[in-house]
UniProtKB/Swiss-Prot annotation:
It holds the Pfam family Proton_antipo_M. GO terms for cellular component: plasma membrane. NDH-1 shuttles electrons from NADH, via FMN and iron-sulfur (Fe-S) centers, to quinones in the respiratory chain. The immediate electron acceptor for the enzyme in this species is believed to be ubiquinone. Couples the redox reaction to proton translocation (for every two electrons transferred, four hydrogen ions are translocated across the cytoplasmic membrane), and thus conserves the redox energy in a proton gradient. Its main location: membrane. This is NADH-quinone oxidoreductase subunit N 1. Belongs to the complex I subunit 2 family. The chain crosses the membrane at residues 4-24, 32-52, 60-80, 88-108, 113-133, 148-168, 178-198, 220-240, 251-271, 279-299, 307-327, 351-371, 374-394, 416-436, 439-459. The gene is nuoN1. InterPro entries: NADH-Q_OxRdtase_suN/2, ND/Mrp_TM. It is an enzyme of class 7 (translocase). One of its GO terms (molecular function) is NADH dehydrogenase (ubiquinone) activity.
């Protein structure tokens, strides 16, 4: 087997798997893409761990490659029965999902600016179509446009920043170009961080997030929140690890303000929401503020904390959005908090998964979210960001209220429910995915060293 095939084996599995599924969508009238899409991801899984990346890879890229497979597999499992019951099932969904996952993998693997931009846009273009997958749903079409239009502007800002960095350094490699000090490099890096910050929903470029998450189908919102943000976070961590000390002195104060603003906007915004999907959207914004705080300390021990929190975030968002989809009726997603009253008694298994996801998002023990926040705050304190860490702890306490609000609705007295809420069957694959997510959140909360040891080994081999 050639070196090219070995190096790019995971990418080839996703690329040809997506192509095969799209060809099936044209050749068959009955959707059958679930099985080849799942097979493509399982085929790529050994290579994702064996190959850290096309250029030798980094610990971040190697870790993210494994995480991506879990995110994509869980999304396919959650999407299968959901799309079928809502009348928009088709093989094209799975093909687009595989190609979007390919873009995310390229983004995480990127060692040069061109690959970073290509991966970012490949993932985004497929997500635009997935968000608007149900053509008779005006809310989904509107959400896709609200993601596409500001996304195009963010790409322009990102590319302009890359052009400035290239003009200052003469190199398209991320590490080499950021090593060149100077105001032009710092200006370009600032624009790049704004572009990546849009994908991460960092304040103040976060305004698209609640509308898009509310309009997207719940499993697609789960993939958008966990996969897209994990890919962008991997790129952010890589870039931050290569920034010169001179550029840090110029830009890190602005990043600290952005992290604090993101944590505050996300948690306070979630408290004020009556829509469950908008609540989860604001919660995901807040989580990215914690990731940004860890990214600032990536060279001071924050890298391991960031990767643990990234894995926990992916699991908690998949669990929460997946449970929302599983608790929804055939017509549309159950989105009003009032509609969740007493579902903990009517549908205890699905409500329990949502409760675990919410508890982890709020950082309550014994979940992975609690351990992740503890590690992130510890890394920030060790790096000297005492004020930012203290502010983050305050916002995390505020964030507990939105979780308790929805949890209180879920477990309101059964006697107050006038009519049992009908939901669709999640199917064996969806049920298994929800169970794995919930077990993972509790397992990592009780035994965090299992994942922390693997992450430490990756950094030790860097």
């Amino acid at each position: 087997m050639s070196a090219f095939v070995v190096a790019y084996f995971p990418h080839l599995c996703l690329a040809f798997g997506g192509l095969l599924v799209l060809c099936l969508s044209m050749a068959r009238s009955v959707p059958a893409g679930f099985y080849p899409a799942t097979a493509a991801l399982f085929a790529a899984l050994p290579g994702l761990w064996a190959v850290a990346g096309p250029q030798g890879g980094s610990p971040i890229a190697c870790f993210y490659a494994g995480l991506l497979s879990v995110i994509a597999l869980a999304t396919i499992a959650l999407l299968a029965r959901y799309a079928e019951r809502r009348g928009f099932a088709g093989d094209a969904l799975y093909g687009l999902l595989l190609w979007s996952a390919l873009g995310m993998l390229l983004l995480a693997d990127a060692d040069d600016w061109i690959m970073l931009a290509v991966g970012l846009e490949l993932a985004s273009l497929c997500l635009y179509a997935l968000i608007a997958a149900r053509l008779d749903d005006n809310l989904g079409t509107e959400a896709a446009l609200k993601y596409f239009l500001p996304g195009a502007m963010a790409l322009a800002v990102l590319l302009f920043g890359m052009a400035l960095i290239y003009a200052a350094s003469g190199s398209m490699e991320i590490a080499a170009s950021l090593a060149a000090p100077g105001p032009l490099t710092a200006a370009g890096l600032a624009l790049v961080l704004v572009g990546v910050g849009f994908k991460l929903s960092l304040a103040p470029v976060h305004l698209w997030t609640p509308d898009v998450y509310q309009g997207a189908p719940a499993p697609v919102a789960a993939f958008l929140s966990s996969g897209s943000k994990a890919a962008a976070a991997a790129a952010l961590l890589h870039v931050c690890s290569e920034v010169s000390p001179e550029a840090r002195e110029l830009l890190w104060p602005a990043l600290a303000v952005g992290a604090g603003l993101t944590m505050a906007v996300g948690n306070l915004g979630a408290v004020a929401q009556a829509s469950v999907k908008r609540l989860l959207a604001y919660s995901s914004i807040a989580q990215m503020g914690y990731i940004l705080m860890a990214a600032m300390a990536v060279n001071d021990g924050g890298g391991e904390a960031a990767l643990f929190y990234l894995a926990a975030f992916a699991l908690m968002d998949l669990a929460a959005f997946g449970a929302v989809g599983a608790l929804s009726a055939q017509i549309g997603d159950r989105d009003d908090i009032a509609a969740y009253r007493g579902l903990g008694y009517v549908h205890p298994w699905r409500a329990g998964v949502l409760a675990i996801g919410l508890a982890s998002l709020a950082g309550l023990p014994p979940t992975a979210g609690f351990v992740g926040k503890f590690l992130v705050f510890g890394a920030a304190l060790s790096a000297g960001y005492v004020g930012l860490a203290a502010f983050g702890i305050i916002t995390a306490v505020v964030g507990v209220f939105y979780a308790l609000r929805l949890l209180a609705a879920l477990y309101m007295r059964e006697s107050l429910i006038a009519h049992p809420a009908a939901v669709y069957a999640a199917g064996p694959a969806g049920t298994l995915a929800l169970g794995v997510m919930a077990a993972g959140l509790v397992g990592l909360g009780l035994f965090p060293q299992t994942l922390l040891g693997a992450i430490a080994a990756l950094f030790g081999g860097a």
